[in-house]
């Protein structure tokens, strides 16, 4: 049901309830009606929408719920505005009100899609509000792995979905460029620069073994210049003894590589925030001092502890170890203070499920500061791991990273790049990257975040209905082909279709397809409210299925203009919604396949 129709029907039902309540209790009686909730019945035979308001009000009004439902329906159907919207109403079970919409109400979605085009499904209900969405936030110690890819897909699609409701969305990447891992990166690069490789005597135990380290060392020795998208260029000095210069070069090199990974994946950020800046600007010390002054800490065994149990944690946590270094959640607290100070009252973090333990600590630290941050800030979406399969076997390593599969590997393999071709990226064309990006983005968003995901490369390469992204894209391409044929055979352009006689669309398949189109706006609202971007992929697969059912049941290109143009109008509206949904996922909508 279209949102406008839903709002109208809710208002009509609320007015009907008020009329009945006044008739039963008197116009002056105190009465608070519950909010009207409309749901689509699970069984199509039960109508298009169902409402349980009679069951909610029977006791307060002192009447039988089924009799009350009959009175509400009588009041509803007597209203002129309802007569063009509701075709039939019936009472089911103990008092459910089941309504069947008129054919015109169902067909109205086609005109709405034509009128709104790419904006169909979007809303401005949250206009003026802003959201900070933090995702990926990888250490700059190697290429992005498939877990980062899942975060990138979840974050980018969720940002699109939230923006569709009118929010101004700020995409942020938090670089963990301070700590032990960065030191390990520096000594790894230094060892490679000295001619060592994994397994050699003198190779550091904590070093990274991927071939990308050798690439960094080579460019450092050659005096190459590298730059991340938001930073100053850094030139390799070639000095193998200058560990600080090596560290700066290696971090910038890998930030540039991660930028390239994200570019290949079609993901852009509004801001990159460096963990190191929290230290250089004194924000970590300031946060710790504020918690000490607030009485949220205590000293024990030479360490500084945070009273996280005050906020529901199972035990208190160390903030500053006996050696004077901070535990990893302390800069996270300082970082989230900056989010609050920048005016972001709604913040969503997308992280791996292994970060679950840090949630209570960060929230406890923020509450302990007593600066007005609400409980439950920030929101979190936690995702589980991704397993990559190829030829029936799990893929655990790649030439790029040595110990894990990278996002770029996954994109190139899913686009059809041959095994080993990733070592020669110049041989991989843009079409391969586009196919791969589409497959990876769609696949990684096609399951709920809190479920483990098996990414099957062989399935991503299939060009049949088993491959969900192919299935949806093929529906779009097939409609484009039909509309092109409509133009060439009958000289009917898509621009003429809004004038079609939609009363021709009465079949069960046409009705089901129109109802699915009308669900798109509510689906987006639900996905935004529940932080559930997978709902878009679920919807698109269902919509493609409804299209195929309709197309297989009814011929579109017939000589009789009335049914032909009506069916073509339905296809054109379906094509637009498929395009809109694919754009929400950051996936292309090809006109030919």
Swiss-Prot record:
'HIGH' region (motif): residue ranges: 138-148
UniProt-recorded Gene Ontology molecular function terms: arginine-tRNA ligase activity; ATP binding
PROSITE patterns: AA_TRNA_LIGASE_I (PS00178)
Protein location: Cytoplasm
This protein's UniProt keywords: Aminoacyl-tRNA synthetase, ATP-binding, Cytoplasm, Ligase, Nucleotide-binding, Protein biosynthesis
EC number of the protein: 6.1.1.19
Similarity-based family: Belongs to the class-I aminoacyl-tRNA synthetase family.
Subunit structure comment from the entry: Monomer.
Protein name: Arginine--tRNA ligase
Source organism (scientific name): Burkholderia cenocepacia (strain ATCC BAA-245 / DSM 16553 / LMG 16656 / NCTC 13227 / J2315 / CF5610)
């Amino acid at each position: 049901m279209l949102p406008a129709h839903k709002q109208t029907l809710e208002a009509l039902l609320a007015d009907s309830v008020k009329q009945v309540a006044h008739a039963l209790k008197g116009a002056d009686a105190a009465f608070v009606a519950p909010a009207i909730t409309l749901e689509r019945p699970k069984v199509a035979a039960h109508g298009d929408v169902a409402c349980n308001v009679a069951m909610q009000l029977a006791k307060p009004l002192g009447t039988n719920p089924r009799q009350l439902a009959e009175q509400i329906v009588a009041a509803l159907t007597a209203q002129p505005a309802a007569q063009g919207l509701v075709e039939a109403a019936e009472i089911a079970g103990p008092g459910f009100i089941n309504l069947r919409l008129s054919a015109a109400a169902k067909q109205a979605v086609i005109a709405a899609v034509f009128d709104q085009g790419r904006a169909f499904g979007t809303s401005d209900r949250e206009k003026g509000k802003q959201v900070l969405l933090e995702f990926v936030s990888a250490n700059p110690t190697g290429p992005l792995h498939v877990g980062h890819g899942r975060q990138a897909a979840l974050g980018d699609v969720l940002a699109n979905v939230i923006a569709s409701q009118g929010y101004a969305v700020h995409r942020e990447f938090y670089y963990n460029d301070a700590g032990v891992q960065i030191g390990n990166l520096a000594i790894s690069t230094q060892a490679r620069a000295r001619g060592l490789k994994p397994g050699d005597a003198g190779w550091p135990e904590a070093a990274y073994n991927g071939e990308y380290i050798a690439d960094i060392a080579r460019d450092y020795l050659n005096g190459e210049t590298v730059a991340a998208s938001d930073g100053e260029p850094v030139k390799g000095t070639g000095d193998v003894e200058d560990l600080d210069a090596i560290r700066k070069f290696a971090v910038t090199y890998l930030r540039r590589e991660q930028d390239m990974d994200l570019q290949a994946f079609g993901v852009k950020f509004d801001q990159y925030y460096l963990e190191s800046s929290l230290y250089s600007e004194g924000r970590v010390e300031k946060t710790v001092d504020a918690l000490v002054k607030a009485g949220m800490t205590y000293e024990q065994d030479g360490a500084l502890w945070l009273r996280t149990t005050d906020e529901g944690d199972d035990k208190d946590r160390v903030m500053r170890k006996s050696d004077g270094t901070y535990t990893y959640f302390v800069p996270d607290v300082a970082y989230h203070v900056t989010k609050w100070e920048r005016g972001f009252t709604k913040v969503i973090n997308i992280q791996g499920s292994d970060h679950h333990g840090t949630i209570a600590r960060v929230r406890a630290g923020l509450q302990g500061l007593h600066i007005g941050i609400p409980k439950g800030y920030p929101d979190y979406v936690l995702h589980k791991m991704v397993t990559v399969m190829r030829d029936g076997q799990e893929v655990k390593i790649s030439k790029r990273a040595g110990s894990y599969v990278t996002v770029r590997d996954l994109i190139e393999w899913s686009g059809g790049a041959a095994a080993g071709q990733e070592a020669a990226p110049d041989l991989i064309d843009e079409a391969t990257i586009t196919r791969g990006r589409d497959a990876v983005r769609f696949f990684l968003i096609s399951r709920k975040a809190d479920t483990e995901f098996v990414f099957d490369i062989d399935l991503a390469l299939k060009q049949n209905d088993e491959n969900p992204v192919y299935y949806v894209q093929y529906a779009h391409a097939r409609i484009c082909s039909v509309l092109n044929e409509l133009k060439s055979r009958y000289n009917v352009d898509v621009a003429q279709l809004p004038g079609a006689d939609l009363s021709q669309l009465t079949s069960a398949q046409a009705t089901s397809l129109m109802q699915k189109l009308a669900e798109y706006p509510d689906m987006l609202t639900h996905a935004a409210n529940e932080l559930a971007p997978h709902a878009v992929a679920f919807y698109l697969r269902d919509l493609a299925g409804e299209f195929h059912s309709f197309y297989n049941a009814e011929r579109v290109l017939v000589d009789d203009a009335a049914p032909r143009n009506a069916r073509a109008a339905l296809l054109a509206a379906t094509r637009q919604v498929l395009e809109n949904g694919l754009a929400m996922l950051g996936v292309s909508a090809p006109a030919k396949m």
